[in-house]
Amino acid sequence: MHLKNLSLLNYKNLKTAEFDFDEKINCLVGNNGVGKTNVLDSIYLLSFGKSYFNPITSQNINHDSDFFVVEGEFKKNDKAEKILASAKKGQKKIIKRNNKAYEKVSDHIGFIPTVIISPADRDLIIEGSETRRKFMDGVISQSDQSYLNKLLQYTKLVSQRNSLLKYFAANNTFERDTLEVYNLQMSSLGQDLFEKRKEFLKEFIPIFNKRYADITNNKEIVDINYKSQLFDNSLANLLEENLQKDMALQYTSVGTHKDDLSFEIEGHPIKKFGSQGQQKSFLIALKLAQFDFIKKISKVNPILLLDDIFDKLDENRVAHIVALVATDELGQIFLSDTHAERTEKVVKSSNQSYKIFKL
């Protein structure tokens, strides 16, 4: 699978742009602020139906316009697939496949498997549990539509239960039967999500460990630990046991929406004990493991977006990463950098076809 061409209209700072891509490696070079990252983000948009960097659609429209259109033609299983994403201020975002609009944007997720590696990934280490859950859910969802649907249902139920708890507090009332309806549905869906996450991590963590060892030449031991309240109790019991607490807080304090991943190096949290270089290697291994996992499950090479990959990494390390991906039936890579010569030196060493676009 690869992206053949891309056209942008009023997407972020890019008023109009068109690209015909190489099916192997594509390099976007230019000074900071010219829109390299926004081109990569537009490809991510065509894959996920949303921006990687700013999920608020209206803020991705060029300041001088009230709409954007992003269109790409992909080749998948020897068939042309045209994907279009458009948005207008005050209106619902539209995602189309071959001129037919999806009823739900979520129905498109997984059709164009894509992995992005970006300096913004550091949030996975320094931010709260929600960021890491989103990563885990994103990897699973690209290869399991049923999981995504259950996750969306569960998230909606949590929001509705929270609204009910606020209603109880505001009106000094309590309706156990109504609450039980939410508890039952949440318990079933939450348990399913928990089991799927365990199953996923059992397969994902060895892939991640191998990637980290490849990148660092086996320098240190890293691990990912799944933290969930459901290891100790069923969600049904947890909801019942924490009812008074939830009533006081006016939100749901227990469930799979509180799960987290603990990223560790030599048995300690990498956030506190890992150097910048170790953290960067950890994140890249995480994303390359995502690439490997999706490829294994979907039998399709994901598109790989490398945003500002030279940030905190030297040329040799970047060349090593490109080579790692290139060794095993390369998919399509998009790479952004400020230095054309440095970029060309790295991609030449991969012995793959490439194009360089100067923005």
From Swiss-Prot:
Keywords: ATP-binding, Cytoplasm, DNA damage, DNA repair, DNA replication, DNA-binding, Nucleotide-binding, SOS response. GO terms for cellular component: cytoplasm. GO terms for biological process: DNA replication; DNA synthesis involved in DNA repair; double-strand break repair; SOS response. The keyword DNA damage applies. It is found in: Cytoplasm. InterPro entries: DNA-binding_RecF (IPR001238), DNA-binding_RecF_CS (IPR018078), P-loop_NTPase (IPR027417), RecF/RecN/SMC_N (IPR003395), RecF_2 (IPR042174). Its main location: cytoplasm. ATP binds at residues 30-37. The RecF protein is involved in DNA metabolism; it is required for DNA replication and normal SOS inducibility. RecF binds preferentially to single-stranded, linear DNA. It also seems to bind ATP. Belongs to the RecF family. This is DNA replication and repair protein RecF. The lineage of its organism: Bacteria, Pseudomonadati, Bacteroidota, Flavobacteriia, Flavobacteriales.
